[in-house]
Every structure is written in C-alpha cells, then in structure tokens.
C-alpha cells in the first residue's frame, strides 16, 4: 500500500475545518507554507504533528461551542465561524501588519515551540507601529463568538475599541464588523428553517431509570447537521491500509476539550456557563447523547437528535460555578458531540487534586471562590485515600461519604454495562494548565460566577489551577481515567479496563476490542496505582551526580492493604528499566519524603534495603530521607541513608531538577505519566505482535514457489493477512501519537529509545514486506503475460488459422461478400485484441520467434482484408452497372413516340455509363483476384452497356432526321406552342447529340435516372459545348426554357418547386459552395496526391531498409562516432516509418485531408529528423574539412552516401505534397486545412531545429551542461546593450537558461560560439517594449547587483515578437509547474519517525503568494504588456518592477502543463497571446488587477538549485 502523503493529511484536516475547501484552499495553503518555512524550518511532518493536529482540536472546539446554540439548523456558510465561504476568519498565519487600521483585529492560531498552539487576537498596539498580541484562553472558546467576549477585550484596552475583524480571501483582505460576523446566516425554505426538527423529539429527553441505558433514539432528519456536529469532516475508516498516515492525538495541555466531552468523569463538573437558568439570555444547545453498545450497530453515529443538557442548576454541594449533572443523565455528554470527541479532542488527563467538589463533602476546607487556598494535611490524607480508592485494582476502595453512597448504587448498576463512549478518544483525562515561560503555575481565576450570573471571566474545563508547590487537592473521591475509560461515576468498576480505548472513527469498525486493548491485569506485578497516586514518581530530574531522581511519598492514611515487598520490588525494577543504559549503570537516587510524618508501609524499608544491597551495580545507589522531625523508628537502624532537611535539598540537586513540592521547578503529573506508559506497554506489545506476523509473512513470500496453475494478479495473501491484522490498524492509528506523547513526559529525556526502536523495526519490516509484495506482483504479471502470449500463439495456430482460411473464398455475390465482411470485421477485432495482449507480453520479455509469428499472421490478415475489399468493390461495380442498364432500357421502353431521344440524352447526362477506363480497371481487379466467375460477369456487364449505348444512339439519330423534326413541331403546336411567342428560341436537339468521337465518360456517381422534368434544367447547360459564333441553344421542356447560361421560368409548372428546392442546395446550378464538377475534380486531385504520398512512403521505407556502406578508413574517431549516431537515428526512423507511419498513411487513402492530423499525431517521432539533421551537418562539415587532404576533387575524397541523404530529401517531398494537398482542400474544411498547415510548419521546423542543436554543441568555454537546461526554444543574434556597453551577441534561450555567446570563425567547417554569460530563467524578468523602434525589449534579473538589466535589439519585429511571446509563455509555464513541484514535495515516507518531507528554502518558495493573493514581498520579475488589462497600477511599483497581480484565477493554475507548446506565438489584435499552429491555449493571463501585471518566474517558481548554481550566479566573462 502506498503511504498517505503529508499533503493529504494537511488537506483533509483543512477541508474538515474550512469547508468548502475548494474556495478556501488558496488562502489556507499559502498560510501553511508560510508557517512551515518560517517556524518549522520546512519540516512538514513536525508542522503537522506539533501545530496542525493540536490546532484542529482547538478550532473544532471553537466551532462546536459557537454552533452549540444553533443545533438542528442548516447554516448558509457551512464553515462558520472559522470561515465564510472563501473568507477565512481564523487565520493559520500572520497577516501583514500594514493592513491593520485602528479598530481592526484578526484571530490567529499562533504556533509555539515550547507548547501547543494557542488562539490569539492581533491588533495594532495603542501607540501604533507594531502589532499587539492578546492571548485567548482556552476557556474563552466556549463564548468566543459572542459580543460579550469582544466587550471584555475592549474593557482592558486603554484607548480605541476593536470592532472590525479582518478576513483573508484569495481576492485580498476583507473587513467585517464583529456584530455581523457572530450572527450566522441560515438556509430558509417557505418561511421555515430548513433542517429544524420541531416534532421529532421533545426539548428534553426523558431519562430512563438510573443505571439503565438510554432508549434508542430516532435518526436525524436530513439537513439537521450543523458545523458544530462534526459531520462536515470527511468520514475516515478506522482500518487504515499499510503506512496510512492517520491523525495523531497529541496532549493539548490545558485544553478543556475532553473535560466536557468525556462522559462519566465525575458527578459534578466545573464548566463555564453563559446564561443563567432564569431565562435572561439564550440557553445552551440541546445536548447530544452517547449510544450504548449493544443497542444497535457499532456505526450508529448519525442518530444524535438534540436533547436538553443539564436540567438542574448547581447543586448545594458543588462549589459555586459548577453545574450539577442529574443522576439520571450520567451518560450525557456536554461538549463536544460524540464523533467530534473521537476526531478532534486531545488528551486531557485527570491528575489527583485537580477536580474540586466531592459527592457530599461540601466545600470543606476550600476557601471562597477565586481565592488561593492551601489545604491542610487532613484534607491531603483524605485526597490520597480517595485517589487510591478510585484506582485500586480488584474493587477495594476507600469508604465513601454518605453523600457518595447513593451515587455508588448507580455506579454499581452501571458498572457491568458496556462503555457509554463508543466514539470518544481514550484520552479522557482531565489535565491542568501548563504555563510555559513562568516559574510557577498561575493563580486561580479571580472570579468564578455562579450559574445564574451572566458570564464567567475565566472558567476551568479540567479543574481549577491553584497556587503553591504542588498543592493540588481533591475534596472527594478523585478519578483517574488511567485505562482509557472509567465507569460513569465514582471509582472504577471491578472489571479490568484497557489502557487505551479503541478509537471509533467514521462509521465504526469491526476490530475486536480484546485484540487491541491490553488490560492492567496483564501486568499484575507493576503497581500502576502506586505510581498514579504519587507514591512513586520518576520526576525526570537528576541529582548532582547525574543519577535519576525517584521520589517516594508514603500516603496518609496508608493504603489498605499496603503494597507487598514483591510489588514494590517489581515496580522499582520497572522504573529502573525505563532509563537509558548509562543511567541504569549509575543507579537511582531515591528521595523519601517524610515531612508529613506518614506511616511507612511495612514492606518499603526492606524493599529499599534489598535493592541497595543486591545487583551489580545496585539498583538504589543513594537513599535520601527528607524529614522535619526525628527519624521514625523503622528507619533508626537503616544503614546508608542520608537525612536531609528542606534547606539541604539545594546541595542534592539543582532547583530545575526538583519538584514544586520540594522547592523546584518541575511539576510532573503522576496520572498523566502512568497513562502514557501504560499506552507505551500496549504499544510495545502491539509492535512485537505485528513484527512477528510481518516477519512470518516475509518468510512465506520468500519461500513461495511458483504456482503451476494460473493465479489472479493481486495482493499476496501474506500481505493481506498482515493488513487485516487489527493490531497493525491499532498501531497505525495510535503508534505515532503514543510516541509523541511519550516525548512530552518529564522523564522522557532520561528514558531509553526502546519503544521508538521497536516501532522503527516494525516500520522497516513493513517496508521490506511491501517491497517483496511488489516484486511478487510483478512476477505474477510477467507470468500472466507469458501465459497470455502462449494462449495467443496457440489460438493463432488453431482456431485463428482456421477462421482466416475460411475467408479465402469470400463468395461470388454481393450479399455473400457483405455477410463475409461482417464476419471478418468481428474476427479482425478479436485478432487485434489478442495481438495487443501478445505484444504487451513481448514488451516484458523479447522473443524473436514469437514476434515473427505475430507479424506473419498480421500480414496475412491484412492481405485477406485487402482481397475482401477488392472483391466487394468489384461486385458493387457490377451491381451499379446492371442497375444503370436496366433503368436505361426501362426508360426507353416506357417513353412515348418522339421522346426517346430526349430521354436518352438525359440518361447519358444524368447517369452516364461506366467509362472504358473504369471497365479496364475492374478487369484488372478481377484478374488480380483470380476469379473466373468475376471475369465472366465483367464481360456480361460490358456487353449490356454497349447494347444500351447502341439503342440510345439509334433513337437519337432518328430524332435528328427531318421527319422527326416535323413531328416535334406538330407536337409542340398541339400542346400549347403559342405560349412561347414569336421570339422564343427554336428548340434544337443538336445540342443533345454526342460528340462524333465518343471518348471515355466519367464514371457514374449513382445508378438512378432522374425524371426529365426534374433534372434536365440542372444539367442542360453542360450537355454539349456550343460552336464558336453560335447563339446559345435552349431546350423546351413543359414550359421551361433552359439555356446554357440561365433558367427562365415561363409557366407555373407543378414541378417548379422541385427545381427551386434543388437550386438552393450545393448541387444547384447556382448553388452555394463549389460546383459538383469542381468538387469532383478536387477530390480526384486529393486522392491522386495521397496515392503519390503513399507510394513515396513505400519507396522511402524500402530505401531505409537498404544497407549503408561502411565509412572509409580516413575518417577520424570523432567522425566515426558521428557516423554511428547518424546510422542509429536512421534506424529509428526506419522503425517508425515501417511500423507506424506507413500504415497511418494507408489508412488515410479514402480520407485525404486526414493526412495533416496523421503528421501531427506523430510530431514527437518527427523530432528524430532534427537529430538527424544535426548529425548529417556534422558529418558534412567533417568530411569537408578532410577533403583538402585527398589532393583531388571532392569525388576522390570521402563523401556522404546517398542512403544518408535520403531522410532529408524525404522531408522536402513531404512538404511539397502537403502544400499541394492544402491548395486542393476547399475553404469549408477549415479544421483539416489548419491541421495540414500545422503539419507543413512541423516539417519546416525540423531543419532549423537540427541546426539549432548543432549550434548548441558548438558553444565553447561553457562549464554548464546545456543538455540539462531543457529544450532550446530560440537562437538568434541580437545587439545587446548593458549600461554603456553595446555589442553583438548570439543568444540562446533554453527552458531553464539564457545564454549569451559570441560568434567566432569556422572551426572545421562549422560555426563556433564562445560563451560569455548565462542566467537562469527562474531569475529572469521581461519588459516587452523599450523605446519607440519596436525592436527592443529588456531582460532583467533578480539577485543581481543594482538590478542587472540587458536591452536586446532584434533585427526585425518578427524576431522580437517571437522572443517576447516565448519568454512570457515560458514564465507562466514555470509558474504552473511550480504548483506541481509543491505538491510532489509533500510526500510521506512511512509510519516511522523519519522525516517525511524536505521542503525548499524560504527564498525558493513563493507559491504562498499566489495562493493567498498577496504580493510576493516585492519579488518583482516580469511586466508583460501583452497581458495588460484596465485597472489601476499597484502602488509603489514601477512598470518594470511590478509585483504579482492581486489575484490570480485559480483556474489558471489547474493546467496540464504538458499541453503548453514551445512554438512561437503571435499576438492577436486584443493583445492577448494567441498560440501558434502547434500551441495549446491552455494558459491564461493573470486576473485583471493592474495596468501591467507581472510574471515572476523566480517569484512564482522556486526551482531546485542545479549543480552549476555558482556558474549561474556570478558572471564568468564580461558581456
């Protein structure tokens, strides 16, 4: 499986937060690149893990809180409040401070190297001139998008109220009043709110009996999901494929996410409240309910109808500001919804002493809200006893207070139920705030308002923070969600709980939990509860000797039962095993804190004594006892211990190595540490299990034998088995997150790299397995192709041969031939399909014998097809001839007396008999087929045609006699001859007579004879040529006079409409378009040219197949190499023309005008002629240099063989024939004519292209490899002006390089160019017009001293236009290509901890400028006047140094760069670049926004530095 790139992870995260992503992508991706470059030093993986994922959790919380009160409504902007369509509200990078005005501000997620990213408000400082950053507390996320929040900000500002929020968009920065921003828009329909569900559920769901699961809930109605529900994120399946980069969960320190999102944490929660229950303001939204397992499918994530949250206010027992959760609603989730917790919430571990408020203990020693407090020893003892009771394994818990016993009954009822959280993350622990940068935690908030007050200034989601050295007290039974989830309330249930709950994402998965979760009971000897309660703490500090410091604080009152000696030994050995090898050698320094005079566990001192005496080296190297009074009796006889006071701690360890309680700076969280290391234990077991299965799969693949039977190509079964392993899925999903969380522990610097190394071994093993699987699949494909080849060969020699032989005698009738043709088409299609399969197999493994068999069968197939087509043509001719004769005789027999001559003339004119040439051609065709029946039929057709001609001649002769003339006059007088009048021309049939010497007549175009009244007037003018001096003759037919020049309507004949209808068409005598005869003549000429072209191509292929004489001995080694290169190019031309091009031309025989498209389709192959031109000119120059040495004429010296001159002569023939064909094509066939013109241009370019390639090789003194600079676009001489210098230079324009050279004398008969200067086109800018001559343009370059610029004067306007157009197109193409480079660089390398991305330097990346639509920090490059648009110019920039346009249409970057041609372009009248014949107009100019928009080659595209960067950066030779 391919790894999921980091880019996909980034895009999916942004798409989930800022929909629609296609609108917000330009702005967001630019901000992403900016932060990656400036803050994370181009490490995309670190950016993703350290910034983007925590920021997603934070922003998801903000969005959910903002949308909470609008649950059930359909938002008009689905990304509100983070974005409004393309306008981004919460920025991921800083905006230019110059855009800020008084009263403006914007929101940004600010990265931090020392802690998780945070939300901040940025505005102008009161004095102006700088930006002020106001942190937004995590607690404020609950009411961020409210007017009260901004009012609170404005209260603390001395001057100037903030009122307008800045939004970033592709078009620029937008301003929106905060009052409008915080009010979302909804979609309405017919006066009702779309998506509102007024009748499906009551406002408050009735709660069931305590301890029972909630009743099943109906599904949501379509459209009721809001952005805060988490449904706008793409659904991701939990079962990832191999090394699929899934989202990692990082510890968001201080985040309140899971405090409200985790059900069953505690009975009383401290959460911020907005409005009181008295109804003064808006209420909280309907709460979402979690589903119980077993009530439905595991993927029931859509049925979450709104339900009311807490229906009661704060309980009397809870502290002020806390909301009491009713007992019947213990499974209720406050914030965020179930799926949102599963996707976006970070870890929130609960530490002992961080949750205030017990079940019924009242406030106890707690002081007034908001005042710092210090709890006495008694409360501390109560706290620790309650904490241990909550964490005890096996059900032993501390006695509960009377107020808690009632809740315990509900817990017992719920203890055996499945977990109420089906979709939440395992990190459901409450966590304290971490305050980086200060020496100690901040004090508690000044004020926590009650539920009835208006709004809190600062609230705590995970428990309040307090002042003092570790004075974090718990006033009731504390909870440690150490194993991934706990019971709904109170202490943990007796059932062992897994350390990490399976994350249910999307629609759930079918992974068994028992296969993924490792329960605590799997490690019965490691006392996790002792470490979680703070009894044993590996602080992460070291003493003065460098030993790891371990603190032991005995609980007060002591645990019941106390820990045994073996338990303590095992736990201490486990903590010692976590250290690095060097620290393990030094041993542990154990600090026993007895300042509170707690009773010591009986087994503690013997265990320490044993560990101090045993082992090599001993595990405990130093024992320190911290005490206020005298030593306890248990320690009086203990040897090797040092007794210390609090003042002596400074000489033991530095303050930064000690805990807060000991006067130091460290503040470890035991519960957090235990949770992470339990997950590490699970991770190691997963790694070991996966590693075993992967290695087993590798052995199976390496030992797999080649199958005897054919198998389907696909993923090998061992790999499928590994990928289906739920352990691998869990490892993919959680492994990286666990390792990242392990690094966040205080003791991580002291611990070894065992888990990471094991994780890396799994990564490498999976990579090895994938490589073997890919090799296995390739072998399968090869075997399958070879089997197909064998099957094709067997079919060709068997059924194929039999069917081909059946077409040898196609039949003697037209119907039989047509039926045979249908069968042959089906057979030919099958053969071609099988031949394609066979050639695909031969491409993998060449086999000359098989290839020959295929070629022979294909040739025979073509011969049969040709014979069948000729037989069909012959039979169709016979049928048409018989039909013509039959219709002629029928006309003669059915006509009345005196009309036969007219009918005969019409028949001859309208459908003339086949000419003698056509008969001779058909006779040759019959002889070629070798069919006696066809020859007999040919003779019969000829005899019948001659008989009909004789009959027509006989009737025409009779009508031309005097008797016939008198009969016609009488008939005319009786039928209305008075209508003609005295001036009517006398009709004469002499014009109908055939010429005296009958020559060949044109072949019949069709076989039917049209009625005389319909067709005579159309063809009458061309019946017979008039003699010189005679007036034009006319023929009278039913009231119409038809002369050779006009048609005059004499009557209202019923047939008139037929004439008029036909006259309007292209076949009418005055119809539009080319006349019929002219069109026939044009088609005939086209077919003649195509036939000549095919014959010429056949001769050319035969000539290329002839051997070339070997070169003479007088050739130098260099010339011999050129000779061999020319022969190689000639052989490639022979292969191309013989295999492909000849067949293409033969296929165009019936469609002559398709020849142009045929040439263009093989344009890449015709580029071989440019290479051939280069080699031939080198040979000619070299042979010319050798000729004086032969002391004779050229004939006596070496010469170029005729066989090597033939290819270029063929190019000339192609061009001549195509030009003639272009002249014969009619104007209405515009597309074919354009293709022919482009083909002619293609052929003409090859000669010039070859000379350009030769000139490139003639550049001397250049240390740059010009072959790596892309295609050579142009080469022309220019007058170059640089400052006061003016010189003549030959300039070469490559795709990546601009080179100046000077022409020197011939070297061996060829030109030579001396290298002068070179510049990268990525640093180049263009000004199209300089001066008034119209011949000059300017090229200038960034990163040069004083903006180095060169003015180039062309010899003609055409050359100038060609260069400027190509340079402009080149710069835009580089800009489009830069987008692809950016995407390709963000590629994941696996699931290991290796870096996934190497992004270019800051100076080489400016795609963010394009995506954000802002100027690229004065990276001015090119001002192209051909892209001018109306609009004001950008301020502060000169026309020669403009910055990027304010906006670039996104469509301009979604281009297929391969379609952009490098051919010269022209400018149309509008000033836009119009492509040449071969160009594809796929690249658009920039969006209107400035008078001279710019093209920034370097500013748009950051190319990687080539090996010759130094040669390009500094001039080596003066220009």
Swiss-Prot record:
One of its GO terms (cellular component) is plasma membrane. PROSITE patterns: DH_2, PH_DOMAIN. Keywords: Coiled coil, Cytoplasm, Guanine-nucleotide releasing factor, Phosphoprotein. GO terms for molecular function: guanyl-nucleotide exchange factor activity. Residues 1085-1253 form the DH domain. Residues 200-218 have a biased composition (Pro residues). Residues 355-367 have a biased composition (Gly residues). Pfam families: RhoGEF, SOS1_NGEF_PH. InterPro entries: DBL_dom_sf, DH_dom, PH-like_dom_sf, PH_domain, Rho_GEF_signaling-related, SOS1_NGEF_PH. Residues 828-871, 934-961 form a coiled coil. Residues 1265-1372 form the PH domain. Residues 421-457 have a biased composition (Basic and acidic residues). The modification Phosphoserine is found at residues 262, 419, 931, 961, 1082, 1433, 1438, 1474. May act as a guanine nucleotide exchange factor (GEF). This is Rho guanine nucleotide exchange factor 40. It comes from Homo sapiens (Human). The gene is ARHGEF40.
